[in-house]
Amino acid sequence: MILNLDGTKPIYIQISEWLENEILTGSFESDQKVYSQYQLAEMFNINPATAAKGLTILAEEGILYKKRGLGMFVSNSARGMILSKRKNQTLKRLVFEIVLEAHRLNVSKEELISMIEEVTIEEAEE
């Protein structure tokens, strides 16, 4: 992963989202140790405090848990929590933006639904 250092999204958020993606794709399983703040700092050439902040976000959400002296580990419910969070935050925001733009363009609800149905998974992944 390449961090977007010039973007508006803070680096620690990008780190936490990258770790979430690693969990979703199966790179990290339940109860498996994740990278330390120092490993992340070296991997992405960032300050260890920034990496720690990304890990802390996931720990506060219950996606990771800390074993004193051993590091951070993936919680048993991490995958479900990430999926739920992304569905409730990311998808709702995207749908809101699409509906708002459709309204601006005078696209009817039926037309919008038709457009969504026309998009196949293969097209969306391209």
Regions found by a protein language model. Give the residues of each.
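Beta-hairpin "wing" of winged helix-turn-helix
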Residues: 27-28, 32, 60-69, 73-76
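N-terminal helix-turn-helix
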Residues: 33-65
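Short, charge-rich, low-complexity interaction segments located
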Residues: 70, 74-88
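Short low-complexity, flexible loop/linker segments enriched in glycine and/or proline
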Residues: 83, 125-126
